[in-house]
A protein has these predicted regions:
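Segments that shape or occlude catalytic/ligand-binding pockets
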Residues: 34-77
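Extended Gly/Ser/Thr-rich low-complexity repeat segments
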Residues: 97-112
Length: 366
């Protein structure tokens, strides 16, 4: 496998199919628990100070400079209602939601900031201005010193920023889906404006450091596939993806990724034609099999794709997922092992510890 690579270069080389000394370990959403899960694990381990990075030896992920790709200024965070079990808030993205206090599940989304094209125009003018100097606030001397010290690779783009994902955040999923028919010009303007806003911020980053990874958060799939038709994806979204791909080529960015839950097969087929080089998390219960994706897309970077439900089962269930990961590493690489989303509270600490031990051996070539 050759020389030992810095952690960031190892990440990028692994995802782009270049030789590496070993596969990165503990990188991605599939290595992290829900709050209630971590509470359970600390109890089962008898370790109230259990720290997964420290105790399991996770590798560093990407380093992200301070770039605000969302509402600026943000909405004021407000608590609207409280009960012993729930709290209702309006968050800094203007979304009203009801959350469990124990952090055991996703929140319930109650209201969104955009209901009409007029709301969008006002929000665009007041909180989504292009070129606002306050969007990039990184201390570049300190950031470059960090990169020199740690060897991390640089990422721009993050949750909750994507051409579908952010409009969904502004409108709500049902309202966005109907807006493709009822207000298509608003939807198109949202996507085009946001893309321009992000690229203008990334240009400022690229003037200071090398960007290694652009991430786009979409979350636009369900069990049956994409929430909008491939034709709509092509018509509304892909011109924006092409702009991102142009930026990536101009600045030598080697990894461009999309995060979408659910069955992502249609989107992988389409988006890899428009500059996307990596996908995650490949939820198994939605019908994704990363081995089949590897056969169909030999140059696709893949992160995750191991069934988190195995962690509620037996060691034999875990072993089957470890073998899935080992097959991926043996057959073409461009793969970083991980589970297929955040780890739910039914996962046993012993199973997760066992899985981490076995997957670490896969990553290190054992």
């Amino acid at each position: 496998m050759g020389k030992a690579w810095p952690c960031g270069e190892r990440l990028v080389r692994c995802l782009t199919g270049e030789p590496v000394d070993r596969v990165p370990f503990g990188v991605g959403i599939g290595w992290w628990p829900w709050g209630q899960t971590l509470y359970r694990w600390r109890s089962e381990a008898g370790r109230p100070d259990l720290d997964l990075v420290r105790d399991l030896g996770y590798d560093p992920s990407f380093a992200s400079p301070a770039v605000n790709g969302g509402l600026f200024p943000a909405f004021e965070h407000k608590v609207l209602e409280e009960t012993p079990e729930f709290v209702v808030t309006r968050n800094d993205r203007g979304i009203t939601l009801r959350d469990r206090r124990d952090g055991m599940s996703m929140p319930e989304f109650l209201d969104y900031p955009v209901k009409t094209p007029q709301d969008w125009e006002r929000l665009k003018t007041e909180r989504l201005r292009l070129g606002d100097p306050g969007r990039v606030t990184e201390d570049w001397d300190a950031f470059r010193a960090r990169l020199k010290r740690t060897g991390e690779a640089v990422q721009v783009g993050a949750f909750p920023y994507g051409m579908f994902g952010t409009p969904r955040d502004l409108l709500g999923v049902e309202a966005l889906l109907t807006a493709f028919y009822d207000a298509p010009e608003m939807v198109r303007d949202m996507m085009e404006h946001l893309t321009g806003l992000w690229i203008s911020a990334w240009e400022r980053v690229a003037a200071e450091v090398r960007i290694d990874h652009i991430h786009i958060w979409e979350d636009m799939s369900g069990r049956q596939g994409s929430l909008i038709s491939p034709a709509m994806v092509e018509q509304f979204m892909m011109p924006c993806y092409d702009r991102v791909a142009d930026f990536a080529r101009a600045h030598g960015v080697r990894v461009v990724s999309v995060d979408t839950d659910g069955n992502c097969g249609e989107l992988v087929t389409l988006m890899t034609k428009h500059g996307i080089t990596m996908f995650f998390p490949f939820e198994v219960q939605a019908g994704n099999d990363i081995r089949e994706y590897r056969r169909r897309f030999p140059k696709l970077g893949i992160l995750g794709g191991l069934d988190k439900r195995a962690l509620a089962g037996t060691h034999a269930d875990v072993d089957a997922e470890v073998e899935r990961a080992a097959w991926m590493v043996r057959n073409g690489g461009r793969y970083i092992p991980g589970f297929d989303h955040l780890i739910p509270p039914d996962a046993k600490w012993e199973n997760f510890r066992y899985a981490a031990e076995r997957l670490k051996a896969v990553c290190f070539g054992g």
